C-alpha cells in the first residue's frame, strides 16, 4: 500500500480520504486544518522527527504530460517540517530548497524531516524527499514556535509600535512648543 495512490480510486466506494489514511491525526498539534490531499499524511511522528507520504493527484498537474507543479512538492515538504516540531503555534519563516527531479502524476513521495535546536524557539528542520529510492527533494526549513497564534502576536507588535510612535510624536510636539 505504500506506493498505492489513495486518490486514484475507480469508484466512490473505493475512495479513502487522506484523513482516514492518517492514523496519527489525533497526535498532530500543528496546522490542524491543512488539506492532507495537498500536503501528505504522517506515518511516523516522534520528538523532532516526522515522516510523511505525499500522494500526487490530478489537481497538482501543471501540463499535458502529467508534471506535478513544484509548489505542491514544497507544501508537502513544509508540512513534514511542521510535523517534526509538532507545536500548535509553529510557522515557517524561511527555506533553502533543492529539487533534484520532477514528479509525475501517480508518484508517491516519502518525506523524512529531522528537527534541530530543540531548546530554541527558532528551529531548523532538514527535509529529504524520495520517490522509491530516488532523492527528488532536499531542503532546510526555518520555523519559529510562538506562545500564541501569529496573528495575535502580530497585532500586539503593531499596537506596541504605534504606542512608541505616538509617544515620540508627543515628545517632539512638546519639544517644539517648549523650544
Model-predicted segments: where are they?
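Short, solvent-exposed helix-to-loop capping segments enriched in aromatics
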Residues: 22-32, 81-88
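Catalytic strand-loop segment that frames the active site of acyl-thioester-processing enzymes
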Residues: 30-68
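Conserved beta-strand residues within beta-sheet cores
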Residues: 35-39, 94-96, 110-112, 124-126
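Hydrophobic beta-strand-centered segment that forms part of the acyl-chain substrate-binding groove
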Residues: 79-109, 115
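HotDog/MaoC-like acyl-thioester-processing domains
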Residues: 2-22, 89, 104-105, 116-179
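A generic structural signal for short beta-strands and their flanking turns/coil linkers
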Residues: 48-50, 91-95, 109, 121-123, ...
Amino acid at each position: 500500500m505504500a506506493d498505492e495512490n489513495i486518490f486514484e480510486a475507480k469508484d466512490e466506494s473505493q475512495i479513502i480520504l487522506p484523513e482516514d489514511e492518517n492514523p496519527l491525526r489525533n497526535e498532530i498539534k500543528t496546522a490542524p486544518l491543512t488539506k492532507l490531499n495537498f500536503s501528505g499524511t504522517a506515518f511516523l511522528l516522534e520528538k523532532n522527527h516526522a515522516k510523511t507520504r505525499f500522494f500526487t493527484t490530478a489537481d497538482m498537474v501543471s501540463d499535458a504530460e502529467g508534471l506535478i507543479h513544484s509548489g505542491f512538492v514544497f507544501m508537502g515538504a513544509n508540512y513534514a517540517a511542521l510535523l517534526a516540531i509538532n507545536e500548535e503555534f509553529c510557522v515557517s519563516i524561511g527555506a533553502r530548497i533543492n529539487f533534484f527531479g520532477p514528479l509525475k502524476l501517480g508518484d508517491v513521495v516519502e518525506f523524512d524531516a529531522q528537527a534541530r535546536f530543540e531548546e530554541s524557539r527558532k528551529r531548523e528542520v532538514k527535509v529529504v524527499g524520495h520517490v522509491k529510492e530516488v532523492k527528488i527533494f532536499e531542503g532546510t526549513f526555518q520555523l519559529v514556535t510562538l506562545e500564541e497564534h501569529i496573528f495575535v502576536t502580530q497585532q500586539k507588535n503593531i499596537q506596541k509600535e504605534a504606542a512608541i510612535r505616538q509617544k515620540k510624536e508627543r515628545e517632539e510636539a512638546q519639544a517644539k512648543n517648549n523650544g
